Amino acid sequence: RLGKAAVIWRFDPLVLSDDITIDDLVEKIRRIGSQIHEYTEKLVFSFADIMSYKRVRLNLERNNIPYHEWEESQMEEVAERISRLNTDEGWGLQLATCSENIDLERHGITHNRCIDGDLIVRLAWRDKALMNFMGVTISKGGPVAGDMFDNDAIALTDGHFFYSVHKKDQGQRKACLCMAAKDIGEYNTCPHMCEYCYANTSKQAALANWKMHNYNPKGETITGK
């Protein structure tokens, strides 16, 4: 079993428009959270930055979606309401934002590492090949997390511990805290057709690739090639 720690709930991005208000977004989060909070430990969200992504802007304009850019006061309101939901509904989730500059620590919301080396070690520290690849040394005995003599040690199970070797991926945005990794995805492959999506340049291409995948679902690539 993967366990709750391996399942990250993402509500990403939060999009505002003439038809989608902050109340609508918070209610959607409440409804989803009430059903899945027992199966995850973390909720990660972000605020749609439309003008920074030409493809996204064109997608929305092409489909006549009257989007709004987020103002800082609106971000603060959403953060406060999500934090209150997390407490009032008894979810007890870790809350974090993805690639956001705004500081929401006052609401108990941190900046996330969506590809998190420390989490990977926590989940797969018994995989020696993976640990060697990441440059992580797993030790046993001695210092533990919270030890007054070694606050940098991160505790695992069975008395094991490690020291973080998380290194930011320099190829990502400044606000992105992900570790260096290789993307194995492929553009124009999702058939859900979300109007916001930055990964589909063409609905026709996405549907064509989806059909190719269905012809050869066990192919070496997602498109079955």
Write out the residue ranges for each language-model feature.
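Short Gly/Pro-enriched loop/turn and capping motifs at secondary-structure junctions
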Residues: 50, 102-103, 202-203
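Hydrophobic/aromatic-lined pockets within catalytic cores
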Residues: 37, 87, 198-202
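Conserved residues at the C-terminal ends of beta-strands
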Residues: 46, 98, 200
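Conserved AdoMet/S-adenosylmethionine-binding subsite of the radical SAM
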Residues: 1-81
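Local cysteine-cluster metal-coordination motifs and their immediate loop/turn environment
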Residues: 173-202
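Short Fe-S-cluster ligation motifs
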Residues: 203, 207, 214-225
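A C-terminal junction/extension of Radical SAM enzymes
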Residues: 72-174
